[in-house]
Structures are given as structure tokens and as C-alpha cells.
From Swiss-Prot:
Residues 128-153, 457-478, 802-835 are cytoplasmic. It comes from Mus musculus. This is Prominin-2. Disulfide bonds: none annotated. It is found in: Apical cell membrane; Basolateral cell membrane; Cell projection, Microvillus membrane; Cell projection, Cilium membrane. GO terms for cellular component: apical plasma membrane; basolateral plasma membrane; cell surface; ciliary membrane; cilium; cytoplasmic vesicle; microspike; microvillus. It is a multi-pass membrane protein. Belongs to the prominin family. Glycosylated.
Length: 835
């Protein structure tokens, strides 16, 4: 089946235009290999984890702040470095006046407590003796005008004082219980902290080994992705080359079709020309015979009409028009294209396309040996990681560190047990004394309630005086309890104040300001047995303050402790040599695509034969000259019709019969000879025009295409290697990213968790939280609230004694106003006494 030249040329030109140039090499998009996975590493469990303690906020924080401000007023002196130095190094040479000078605020408070301890019991004894003789604390003798105002004022002051006592008692109860509940965990936290610090250095090698073992995580991930690297690289090459290969194969297919069309038309041209020449040899004698007979018949004397002369003219022109023996020969071209095409271009293109589409599988098969070598190199462990734990220089420092902390732990246990024991005694005594204050508060409140009830009941003449008397007795009972518990209260307050206040002002305040660290760093301040820098194994050029700050910032152990400075974490984490070996193995991979030929040898021979055939040199105009001529110069069908008309006009039957016979034979000759030749001429015309339009461009395109394919086959391996190299670099970058994730994770784990000295600073911070926040703050708040209640017992005693007088019944009544009125009227009558 032939094709229209108008459709073939644009298709061929487009396909060739796409195939003539190879795309420039560009760097492949690494995203085509897929998303980089985020590796999940198991958190290395620490044998002893030291969690930082944080002071929890609560409703008592404002009270703690008030106590601290009070203590800052009591103790205005700075940290006594010289006094503490003397006390630690030569206790016998400590001067009392220096201690008193530093503790001046506490001495003043001690004087106040002493006065309280002396005066309150004496006052209580005197009041007791006075009450026994019924000379004080009695009742109101007479009623007067200002009595109600005095009584109301005293009751209000007593109520306010009682409320203050109640608030202080509640706070004392709360802080007492909070102190006791915090002491147990605080005492327990001290050995736990020391135990955790003992493993600060000794546990590092074991944890480093656990870190090194997790190198298998990136190894497994890389090994998993290596299984599909061949197919992935093949897909990358396929995607990059398909914009080149597919147009080339389309051009091959189009050229094959054009070649087939050209040969088909060339063969048709040759066959048709031969057939036309043969047909003309058979057509010429009958045409010539008809011409001669018609001329002889029509040139007779009877043919004198106009119609006859016209027919005579047509008969005279009855001869062959085209001479196909004059057409150019095409035998040489046909000879050159003999047996062309030998290749089935459609099948060849499908095979090449299938080969190209199987490129990922082909690359995967070729990559098997390379992947095996890469996995072999991958299975090894870098030298630095193998020595990560063994090279850690912590054995000597760990021994010294552990011995120091173990000794400190052993020495601290008896003291901690005593602290817990004495705290229990303090808690019991605190509960008893808080209960005593509660008893005073209850007596005051009940006394006030009954006393006020009794006052209202006096308006009734039939009232009983028992309510007021009971209220007064309850108030006096509260006074008795106040005198009774004043001594243990002031003693407990002063002892706890002296201990807790000095802990806060001497230790906690200097700890927060850093003066305590500076004191420990100053040479000579501590005795040789308490050389903390030596015991802790700190570097000689690093002070405790510097060690604390560096550890707080996350410094590693070998930067602070006396370890071997040759330990270099970055050197152990340098896996460049390991990854370089993997890169070399993978970069040595080359793809062999000999099976991808694009143009088979036989197809090339067909196209080269077409190129050498001289198809474009055929003189197609020579064919068109003969084609444009008619087969017979006269229209034989019209001539036959003219003869029929002329025959009908004749009277001579013989002449009429002859004309009709000629007309019939002309029609028969036309149908049998001329019409088939005209069909052959039409066929020849189509082939000639197709070849004339197709041959020049086909020759040029074939030549260009062969040059392009030759160049492409030379450049394609280079292009493939370039694409493969870029894709391999992308893959290696991706895989090296997994090792980078591991190195980053190891560096963070080692410097921030495993080999960091941060637990040292955390232990110091925890010590401050334990001593100052968990113990000292509630302890100081307890004595503050208890002291508050203790000193408010004095106004409570005074107001209770004063108020109780007004609750007892009045035995005598003296009213100046009523007496005067009685004297004016001179009416003798019995007056009732208001009790």
C-alpha cells in the first residue's frame, strides 16, 4: 500500500529533526532516586542516669520569699571566707568575737528569745500567784458608761489576734508537714546522686561500645538500598535517554517506511512503463488501420457536408499521442536497489524499543558483581569506631573519681541517718506545739463565743450567768496554755531558726552567688584532705567554678578531667577512608549497552543502498512529458459517436453500414486498448510525482540520518557513562547521608549524654535544690510561722485576760444618772441589780 507524499514528507522531516541532535548532558536530579530515609537510632540506656531536680512551684513560694528577705535583714554580713578558712584548718584558733561579729543578727535574735524565755514564764508565775489570791484577772466591780466600748474594743483585738494565731498555726502545720515529707526524699537523693556520679567516667566505655554497635543501622539501610541500585540507575539512564532514543527509533521507522514506499513506486514506475510500451506496440497497428480506412471512406465524393468534413479532420488526427519508449530508463537504479529492503524496519524498531525499555533490568544484571563487592566493603567496620571505646582514657580517672565519691558516700550516710532521726523528733515536737497553739486558738474562739452569748443573755431578767462565766474561764484556760507552752515554743523556734537561718545565709546564699565555689577554688582555704580539685580529678588549669560552668554548657569529660588529651572524638568518627572504599567500588561500575544498536547492520545497508541508488537523479520530467500527452490524439469515443451520426444521415445503405462498422470497431478498440493504457498512465503519473517529491528530501534525510546515527552511536556511550556517573554520585551522596546521620547522632550522644560532664554540674545543682529548696526553705518557713505564733501569744494573753473580766457577772451597780433621778422624785422603791 502506497502513501501520499504530502503526508510522508512532514512526518519524515519532523522525526529526522528530533533525531539529528543529542541532548546536552546535564546533572541528573537526585530526587529521582527517592526520598532519603530518616534513620532511627536506639537511645543508649545509661547505667545510672542523673535526672535534674527542679523546685516545684506551690502556694508556699511567697512565704519562702518572705523568710529569705527576713533572713537577709538578720544577716547583713558577707560570706566570712577568713572565718570559714580558720574553722576548717585550725578550729582551736577561731575567735569568739569574730563569730559574734558575723552572727550579730542572730545574737540580737538570741537576746530577744532570751528575754522572751525569761520574762514570759516569770510573768506567768506572777499572774498565777495573783490569780490564786484573786487580786488580778477577776471581774468588773461596777458598771460605767465606757464599759461597752472598752469591752467591744478588747473583743475585736482578741479576735484579730486569734485569727493571726490561727493563720500562723495553719502555716506552721503545713510547713512542718512539708519539711518532714521533703526530708526523706532529700536524704535519699544524696547517696543516689553520689552513686550516679560514680559511673560518670567508669560507665563511658560500655556505653561507647553500645554506640559503636549501632553502626549496623546505616549499614543495613545502605545494604537494603544497594539491592535495588541497578534498577534505579537503569531507570535514571532510561529516563534521561528516552528523549533521544525514542525520536531516533521513530526516525528509523519513518525512513524504513519511506524506503519501502520509494522502492514500491520505483518498481511500479518501471513495470508500468514497460507495460505501456508493450501496449503501444499493440495499439499502433489497429489505430493506423482505422485511420487509413476512415480517410479512404470519408474522402469520397459524397463527403461534402460540414459534418463529414469535421469527422474527416478527426480521422486524420487518429494516431498515437504519447511515446513511452522515450521515457528515461530506471534499470540502473532498480539494480542498485535489488533485494532492498532486507530488513523489516517495523520489527527492528520494536526490538530496539523493547531492548531500550529493558534497560533497568539490563543494568541491574550487570550491577550484580559490583553490588556484591560494595556489600563486602560495607560489611566492614571503620577502624575508628572499633577503637571508640577501647581508646577512651578513663581508667585512672574513673578509679580516683569512684574512690572519692564512694568515700564521701560512706562518710555521709551516718550524718544523713542522724538528720532523718532528728527531723522526726523535730516533726513530733512541731506537731505537739502546733496543736498547743491550736488549743489556745480554740479556747479563745470558744471563750469569745460563750462570752458574747452571755452578754446578750443579760437582757433577760431570768438569765443564767453560767455562759459568761464559762467564756471567761475558757479565755483564762487559753492564757494558761499560752504561759505553759511559751518556753518550748521559743526554744524550738530559736534552735530551728539558728540552724535553718545559717544554712540559708551562710551556705545557700553563697552557693547561689558562686562565692562558695570561689572559696573552694582559693588555695589554702580548704585543708589538704579536702582538696576538691584533686579528689574530683579536675585539670590543673581548671577551677571548680570553671568546671561547673563548662559542664553546665555541656563540655566533654576530657576537656575538664585529667584524661589523656590524645583522645580525639572527631578522629574516631572519621569514616572517610571507609566511605571512600565504598565509593571506589561503586564508581567503577560501567554499563555495556552493545545490545542497544538503534540501527541494525542490514538496515544501515538498506539505507546506504538507497543513498547510493541515484533515485533523486532519475529524469522524472521525461516521464511527465509523455504522461501529459494523450494515448491517442483523437478522442476515439467521440469520433465513434460522430460516425454514428454521420451514418444515420446517409441514404446509401452500404455507406451507412460501413460507417456504423467503423464506429463499432473504434469503440471496441477504445475499450480494449486505450482505456487500460489510460489507467496505466494514471498509475505511472502517481508514482512519478511521488518519487519526484520524495526522492530529493529522502536522499538528504537519509544521508543526515546516517551521519547522525553514526555520531550518536559514538556519543551515546559517553552520554550513558556521564548519566551513570551523575546518578552514582547522587546515590552515593544519599548513602553517605546515612553515615552522616550516624556520625551526627554519635557526636550528639557522646558529647551531650555519654561523655559529658554535665552530670557533675547537675549534681551540684541538685545539691542546691535538695539542701536549699527542698529542706531549708520549708524548715525556715516552719520556724518563721511558729515564731510568729509564739510572739503573738503575748497580745493574746493580754487581750484574753482583759476581755474575760467583762464576761463575768457584775456584783455591784453604780449609776450616777439613776441615783440623781431617784433623789429628785423621793419615791422609795426596790431596785434590781443588773448582774
Amino acid at each position: 500500500m502506497t502513501r501520499s507524499p504530502g503526508l510522508m514528507v512532514p512526518l519524515l522531516g519532523l522525526s529526522l529533526g528530533l533525531a539529528l541532535s543529542l541532548p546536552e548532558a546535564v546533572t541528573d536530579d537526585c530526587g529521582s532516586l527517592g526520598r532519603v530515609e530518616h534513620l532511627a537510632f536506639a537511645r543508649v540506656p545509661r547505667t545510672r542516669e542523673l535526672a535534674p531536680l527542679v523546685r516545684a512551684s506551690g502556694p508556699l513560694n511567697s512565704l519562702y520569699g518572705t523568710v529569705r528577705r527576713f533572713l537577709s535583714v538578720v544577716q547583713l554580713n558577707p560570706f566570712p571566707a577568713e572565718l570559714i578558712k580558720t574553722l576548717l584548718n585550725d578550729p582551736s584558733s577561731v575567735k569568739t568575737d569574730e563569730v559574734v561579729r558575723y552572727e550579730a543578727g542572730y545574737v540580737v535574735c538570741a537576746v530577744i528569745a532570751g528575754l522572751y524565755l525569761l520574762l514570759v514564764p516569770i510573768t506567768g508565775l506572777c499572774f498565777c500567784c495573783c490569780r490564786c489570791r484573786q487580786r488580778c484577772g477577776g471581774r468588773v466591780k461596777t458598771e460605767h458608761k465606757a464599759m461597752a466600748c472598752e469591752r467591744g474594743t478588747l473583743m475585736i483585738f482578741l479576735l484579730l489576734t486569734t485569727l493571726v494565731l490561727l493563720i500562723g498555726m495553719v502555716c506552721a502545720f503545713a510547713t512542718n508537714q512539708h519539711t518532714h515529707s521533703q526530708t526523706g526524699p532529700s536524704v535519699k537523693a544524696v547517696p543516689e546522686t553520689l552513686l550516679s556520679l560514680r559511673g560518670l567516667v567508669s560507665d563511658v566505655p560500655e556505653e561507647l561500645r553500645a554506640i559503636a554497635e549501632q553502626f549496623s543501622v546505616p549499614q543495613k539501610q545502605v545494604s537494603k538500598e544497594l539491592d535495588g541500585v541497578g534498577e534505579n540507575l537503569g531507570n535514571v539512564i532510561h529516563n534521561r535517554l528516552k528523549s533521544t532514543v525514542y525520536p531516533v527509533l521513530a526516525s528509523v521507522h519513518s525512513l524504513g517506511q519511506a524506503l519501502q514506499v520509494s522502492i514500491d513506486h520505483l518498481r511500479a514506475l518501471n513495470t508500468t512503463s514497460v507495460e505501456l510500451q508493450e501496449a503501444q506496440r499493440h495499439l499502433e497497428p489497429p489505430v493506423q488501420a482505422h485511420r487509413e480506412r476512415l480517410l479512404a471512406l470519408l474522402q469520397d465524393s459524397w463527403c461534402h457536408e460540414e459534418n463529414c468534413k469535421r469527422v474527416l479532420s478527426q480521422a486524420g488526427a487518429l494516431q498515437l499521442g504519447a511515446d513511452f519508449s522515450q521515457t528515461p530508463p530506471v534499470d540502473d537504479v532498480l539494480h542498485r536497489l535489488k533485494d532492498v529492503p532486507e530488513t523489516n524496519f517495523s520489527s527492528m524498531v520494536q526490538e530496539e524499543k523493547a531492548t531500550f525499555n529493558n534497560l533497568p533490568l539490563l543494568v541491574q544484571v550487570q550491577a550484580v558483581s559490583v553490588v556484591k563487592d560494595v556489600k563486602k566493603a560495607l560489611a566492614e567496620q571503620p577502624e575508628g569506631l572499633r577503637m571508640l571505646a577501647q581508646a577512651f582514657p578513663g581508667s585512672e580517672a574513673a578509679s580516683r573519681w569512684s574512690q572519692a565519691l564512694e568515700g564521701l558516700e560512706q562518710r555521709s550516710r551516718p550524718y544523713l541517718q542522724e538528720v532523718q532521726q532528728y527531723e522526726t523528733y523535730r516533726w513530733i515536737l512541731g506537731c505537739v506545739l502546733c496543736s498547743a497553739i491550736l488549743l489556745v486558738v480554740i479556747c479563745n474562739l470558744l471563750g469569745l463565743s460563750l462570752g458574747i452569748w452571755g452578754l446578750f443573755a443579760r437582757e433577760d431578767p431570768s438569765h443564767s450567768e453560767t455562759k459568761g462565766e464559762a467564756g471567761a474561764r475558757l479565755l483564762m484556760a487559753g492564757v494558761a496554755f499560752s504561759f505553759l507552752f511559751a518556753v518550748p515554743l521559743i526554744l524550738l523556734v530559736f534552735v530551728t531558726f539558728l540552724v535553718g537561718g545559717n544554712v540559708q545565709t551562710l551556705v545557700c546564699r553563697s552557693w547561689e552567688s558562686g562565692e562558695l565555689y570561689e572559696f573552694a577554688d582559693t588555695p589554702g582555704n580548704l585543708p589538704p584532705s579536702m582538696n576538691l580539685s584533686y579528689l574530683l580529678g579536675l585539670k590543673k588549669n581548671i577551677s571548680i567554678v570553671q568546671a561547673y560552668r563548662q559542664c553546665k554548657a555541656g563540655a566533654v569529660l576530657w576537656k575538664v578531667l585529667q584524661l589523656n588529651d590524645s583522645y580525639d572524638l572527631d578522629k574516631h568518627l572519621d569514616i572517610k577512608q571507609y566511605t571512600h572504599k565504598i565509593q571506589q567500588e561503586l564508581q567503577s561500575f560501567q554499563v555495556d549497552l552493545k545490545e542497544l544498536d538503534l540501527l541494525s547492520p542490514t538496515a544501515r545497508q538498506d539505507l546506504e543502498a538507497l543513498q547510493r541508488s541515484g533515485l533523486e537523479k532519475i529524469h522524472y520530467r521525461g516521464f511527465l512529458v509523455q504522461i501529459q500527452k494523450p494515448v491517442v490524439n483523437t478522442d476515439m469515443w467521440q469520433l465513434a459517436q460522430e460516425l454514428e451520426g454521420l451514418a444515420q444521415a446517409q441514404n446509401d445503405s452500404l455507406l451507412r453500414q460501413q460507417l456504423r462498422e467503423e464506429a463499432r470497431e473504434l469503440r471496441s478498440l477504445y475499450q480494449e486498448k486505450v482505456v487500460p493504457q489510460e489507467s496505466l498512465v494514471t498509475k505511472l503519473n502517481f508514482s512519478v510525482k511521488t518519487l519526484e517529491s520524495l526522492a530529493p528530501s529522502l536522499q538528504v534525510n537519509t544521508s543526515d540520518f546516517l551521519d547522525s546515527v553514526t555520531r550518536l552511536k559514538g556519543e551515546l556511550p559517553v552520554q550513558i557513562n556521564h548519566i551513570l556517573r551523575n546518578a552514582t554520585e547522587c546515590f552515593l551522596t544519599r548513602e553517605m547521608g546515612y553515615f552522616s546521620q550516624y556520625v551526627t547522632w554519635v557526636r550528639a550522644e557522646v558529647t551531650q549524654r555519654i561523655a559529658t560532664c554535665q552530670p557533675f554540674s547537675t549534681a551540684l545543682d541538685n545539691g542546691h535544690v535538695i539542701l536549699c529548696d527542698m529542706m531549708a526553705d520549708p524548715w525556715n518557713a516552719f520556724w518563721f510561722c511558729l515564731g510568729w505564733c509564739t510572739f503573738f501569744l503575748i497580745p493574746s494573753i493580754i487581750f484574753a485576760v482583759k476581755t474575760s473580766k467583762y464576761f463575768r457577772p457584775i456584783r455591784k451597780r453604780l449609776s450616777s444618772t439613776s441615783s440623781e433621778e431617784t433623789q429628785l422624785f423621793h419615791i422609795p422603791r426596790v431596785t434590781s441589780l443588773k448582774l
